[in-house]
């Protein structure tokens, strides 16, 4: 069976991340895509990872997930722009991702709007996943059930495996 160790054994990954700090842990998370990036939740450590430009310094960040069920799910005063007819449908992010997006103007500007690839879909494009995470001396391996994100803390760059 495939695991995070398979990615870590890649010489380039190992050299950048260093040694594991602990065992890999299972993660039941959520993911949301935006016009210019995406967010992944990591509930085991109450973080939201935000991904901007792949392979670029400062291309990702980790934010504390402060969302509570009593928080507003969305802001009724936010007006979603009409996208180009050929583009994905734009939506206001909701829940934990929406709270972070609404409270951080810099992230709103960098990420743009949440998107759904199914134009007629009315539901939020948030997807749940079963994955795994492992912390290292200089980064994190995070699997969302589909791909493995290699998060490097020396320059805050990331890559996919």
Give the location of each predicted region.
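Extended, compositionally biased repeat/scaffold regions that form elongated interaction surfaces
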Residues: 1-161
């Amino acid at each position: 069976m495939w695991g995070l160790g398979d990615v870590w054994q890649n010489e380039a990954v190992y050299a950048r991340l260093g040694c594991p700090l602990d065992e890999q842990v299972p993660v039941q998370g959520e993911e949301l895509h935006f016009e210019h990036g995406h967010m992944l939740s990591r509930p085991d450590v109450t973080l939201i990872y935000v991904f901007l430009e792949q392979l670029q310094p400062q291309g990702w960040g980790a934010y504390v997930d402060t969302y509570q069920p009593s928080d507003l799910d969305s802001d009724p005063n936010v007006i979603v722009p009409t996208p180009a007819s050929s583009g994905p449908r734009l939506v206001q992010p909701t829940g934990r991702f929406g709270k972070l997006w609404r409270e951080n103007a810099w992230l709103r500007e960098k990420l743009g709007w949440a998107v759904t690839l199914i134009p007629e879909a009315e539901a939020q494009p948030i997807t749940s996943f079963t994955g795994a995470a492992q912390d290292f001396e200089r980064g994190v391996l995070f699997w969302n059930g589909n791909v493995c994100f290699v998060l490097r803390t020396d320059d805050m760059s990331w890559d996919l495996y």
